[in-house]
């Protein structure tokens, strides 16, 4: 991409540039470019990171794999902010994702050579520090790049007792930096989608109230933000694709247009797959209802239309936008105390009696200890099987987790009590690992702050500081009434089978809550799912939601909310409080609810036989001449597996024209 194009690319393609890693030594000469002008030419924007720790080579893969205008990297999650906060306690100049710098050391020259601008939230808690580090790196490599950053999200001083308190900013600060000619923009805490809305707003010259276009970019950004989850990673129907294609999925990119519509795709020749299912799964991930609020716009997920445009190309269009809420989300991270755990292995017969004995023994130890842990949680996991052929499959696990503000309460006294039972407890006593010292854990909470009270600043390459004001208009994102459901399927024979034979799912965490997005791929399956999978049925299938997060008998059920999205043939469930105080508290076996959806898919219920006798329910890996070559030393794929069926394209709908209850539903997501 050496030629000049208007928009966010500015004059990068015309500059003299270093090859590969750049020319070492000397101070690069950075010329002052003219402000970039908006354009209607499509914007090709890719993502090379879905989390701090993602594939290191992805930045280079995306730069060399095909044409790009902008390359983003998402490094921040709720847990990451806590980790960076602890880093900053040890070193005040830390607080950003150092991996990003190592990636730039290898790829900054390549990006400059190709005229690709880089936008990343790797700045974490210290975007100014990362911007300085990038400038120093560029100077050492002799690469004349212009670096800008976005700040103002840090509200820690206003929240005493927190390790890090950061508002989720929007994309307009990023846009200001790009309009000023920045080649690299680093931010602190912005919404994940802002990494796309910012470049898009700069490229197309969108006004702050271009809500439909901004909403389209938000949806595209949400699909891209988790990297390979949009290209076949963590995908419910993964067995329908050849194993060779999924071994190393390529990272996604979006071809954005001036109206906010986009095509989700990936570089030619890379692994993975982009189809209606992979895009739908990611759209449902960590969202909730029809309104998806953000700092710049509230996107209406019930207006999204998806179309399979061709191999590995899904068009996203029709997205409507509304004025953003008057407040910003603020993530509060604090140290919650100290935790420790021990897992007792209970093998063979009388598992319940063995569990009762060791539990009583540990409770006796707590009773005589100088300080009983404030929180004690027992969990018996029945992984054992009768008449098992291996010792592992004959064993159940009894997990004991303790937490307390005082490290001593979960330290040596706790460890010693468990160790002292080695010769004095149930037959076959042993633990998975020797008890260790207590470790600190974090707590995440979400708060709100008025948009006008957060000093959103774009710090341009020349050092000027541009204030980004709050939106001129705002709207509280009230819940959307449930749309009419499709006509139910006529009565017929059913068969007891796992839900996952006909439905996909993806789940994730937001603070202490979890969401489970469930979707189907045919109109008949949607007519069944919309009526069958109610909140009551979900509670039956996932008993943990009905007995409280601690699993105690008689505990009140967790709040479960169902959102209906006919345009995606999907239901999105939000389970409140199932993760306790968030992922860092490690209060649950699966602390980020990553597999909650797969548990749901594994549960059996009565499914119409007409849905089970379909290619979708029988799926298997198809022969694919476009798949990358397989590893010659790997076991072959099943040659007898049935081919994948082409799913029906979903119908379309808008909030203004809901489907009639007796007609096939129109897709609101």
Go through each PLM region and give its residues:
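Terminal cytosolic tails of multi-pass membrane transporters
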Residues: 2-26
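N-terminal amphipathic/basic leader segments beginning at the initiator methionine
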Residues: 30-61
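Gly-rich Lys/Arg/Thr-decorated short loops/hinges at beta-loop-alpha junctions or inter-strand turns
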Residues: 37-42, 76-94, 112-114, 153-161
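Catalytic or ion-translocation cores adjacent to nucleophile or general acid/base/metal-coordination motifs
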Residues: 140-152, 198-238, 531
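An acidic, phosphate/nucleotide-engaging active-site surface
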Residues: 154-187
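A conserved active-site cap/scaffold subdomain adjacent to cofactor or substrate pockets
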Residues: 214, 219-315
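C-terminal non-catalytic interaction/assembly regions of soluble proteins
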Residues: 319-496, 510, 515, 519-526, ...
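Helix-rich interaction surfaces within compact, conserved domain-sized segments
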Residues: 554-610
């Amino acid at each position: 991409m050496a030629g000049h194009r208007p928009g966010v690319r500015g004059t990068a393609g015309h500059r003299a540039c270093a090859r590969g890693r750049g020319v070492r030594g000397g101070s690069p000469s950075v010329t002052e470019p003219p402000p970039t002008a908006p354009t209607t030419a499509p914007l090709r924007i890719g993502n090379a990171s879905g989390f701090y720790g993602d594939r290191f080579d992805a930045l280079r893969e995306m730069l060399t794999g095909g044409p790009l205008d902008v390359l983003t990297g998402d490094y921040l999650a709720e847990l990451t902010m806590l980790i960076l906060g602890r880093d900053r306690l040890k070193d005040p100049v830390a607080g950003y994702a150092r991996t990003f710098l190592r990636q730039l050391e290898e790829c900054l020259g390549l990006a400059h050579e190709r005229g690709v601008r880089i936008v990343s939230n790797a700045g974490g808690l210290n975007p100014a520090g990362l911007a300085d580090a990038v400038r120093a790196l560029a100077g050492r490599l002799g690469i004349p790049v212009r670096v800008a950053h976005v700040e103002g999200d840090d509200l820690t001083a206003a929240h005493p007792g927190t390790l890090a308190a950061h508002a989720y900013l929007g994309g307009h600060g990023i846009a200001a930096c790009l309009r000023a000619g920045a080649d690299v923009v680093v931010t602190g805490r912005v919404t994940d989608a802002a990494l796309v809305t910012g470049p898009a707003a700069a490229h197309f010259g969108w006004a702050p109230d271009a809500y439909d276009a901004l909403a389209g970019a938000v949806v595209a950004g949400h699909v891209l933000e988790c990297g390979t989850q949009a290209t076949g990673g963590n995908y419910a129907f993964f067995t329908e694709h050849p194993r060779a294609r999924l071994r190393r999925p390529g990272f996604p990119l979006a071809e954005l247009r001036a109206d906010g519509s986009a095509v989700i795709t990936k570089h030619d020749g890379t692994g993975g797959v982009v189809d209606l299912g992979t895009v739908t799964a990611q759209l449902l991930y960590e969202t909730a209802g029809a309104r998806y609020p953000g700092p710049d716009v509230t996107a209406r997920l019930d207006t999204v239309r998806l179309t399979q445009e061709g191999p590995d190309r899904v068009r996203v269009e029709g997205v409507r936008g509304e004025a953003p809420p008057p407040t910003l989300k603020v993530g509060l991270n604090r140290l919650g105390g100290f935790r420790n755990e021990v897992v007792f292995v209970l093998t063979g017969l009388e598992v319940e009696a063995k569990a009762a004995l060791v539990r009583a023994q540990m409770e006796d130890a707590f009773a005589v200890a100088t300080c009983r842990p404030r929180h004690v949680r027992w969990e018996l996991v029945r992984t054992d099987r009768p008449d098992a052929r291996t010792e592992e499959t004959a064993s159940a696990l009894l997990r004991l987790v303790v937490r307390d503000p005082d490290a001593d309460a979960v330290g040596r006294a706790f460890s010693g009590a468990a160790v002292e039972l080695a010769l004095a407890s149930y037959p076959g006593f042993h633990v998975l690992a020797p008890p260790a010292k207590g470790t600190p854990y974090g707590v995440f909470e979400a708060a709100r702050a008025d948009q006008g009270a957060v000093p959103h600043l774009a710090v341009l390459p020349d050092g000027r500081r541009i204030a980004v004001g709050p939106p001129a208009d705002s709207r509280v994102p009230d819940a959307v009434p449930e749309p009419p459901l499709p006509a139910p399927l006529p009565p017929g024979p059913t068969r007891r089978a796992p839900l996952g034979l006909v439905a996909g799912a993806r789940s994730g965490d937001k603070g202490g809550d979890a969401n489970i997005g469930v979707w189907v791929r045919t109109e008949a399956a949607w007519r069944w799912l919309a009526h069958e999978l109610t909140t009551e049925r979900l509670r039956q299938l996932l008993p943990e939601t009905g007995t409280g997060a601690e699993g105690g008998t008689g505990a009140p059920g967790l709040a479960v909310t169902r959102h209906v999205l006919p345009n995606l043939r999907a239901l999105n469930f939000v389970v409140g409080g199932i993760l306790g105080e968030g992922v860092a508290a490690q209060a649950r076996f699966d602390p980020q609810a990553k597999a909650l959806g797969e548990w749901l898919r594994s549960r059996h219920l009565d499914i119409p036989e007409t849905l089970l006798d379909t290619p979708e329910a029988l799926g298997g890996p198809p022969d694919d001449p476009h798949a990358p070559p397989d590893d010659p030393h790997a076991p072959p794929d099943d040659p007898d597996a049935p081919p994948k069926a082409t799913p029906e394209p979903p119908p379309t709908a808008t909030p203004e024209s809901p489907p009639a209850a007796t007609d096939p539903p129109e897709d609101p997501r």
